[in-house]
């Protein structure tokens, strides 16, 4: 997969999570929950910036094996964090 495709996949998943967070924030009644959701949204934005930056700057640029391992680890990092954000959003939904 190309860097461009990976970036698009990251952005699509992050937008889905961010949209869900906006909806949850809109229907939540308490200001405390809204503040927690805004913190989660901040975490999502930091994750997005970090991930997009990491996509374009692989380590071991001239060694194909290192690049392949770098992107394998990066994909694992992305999937792990997206799953974590999704679980945190699910916890907010259960709290409504």
PLM regions and their residue ranges:
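Low-complexity intrinsically disordered segments
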Residues: 39-42, 50-96
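Conserved acidic
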Residues: 2, 36, 70
């Amino acid at each position: 997969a190309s860097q461009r495709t990976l970036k698009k996949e990251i952005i699509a998943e992050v937008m889905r999570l961010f949209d869900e967070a906006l909806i949850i924030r809109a229907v939540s009644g308490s200001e405390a929950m809204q503040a927690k959701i805004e913190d989660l949204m901040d975490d999502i934005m930091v994750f997005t910036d970090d991930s997009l930056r990491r996509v374009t700057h692989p380590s071991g640029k001239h060694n194909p094996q290192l690049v392949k391992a770098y992107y394998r680890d990066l994909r694992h990092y992305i999937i792990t964090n997206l799953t974590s954000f999704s679980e945190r959003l699910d916890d907010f939904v259960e709290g409504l």
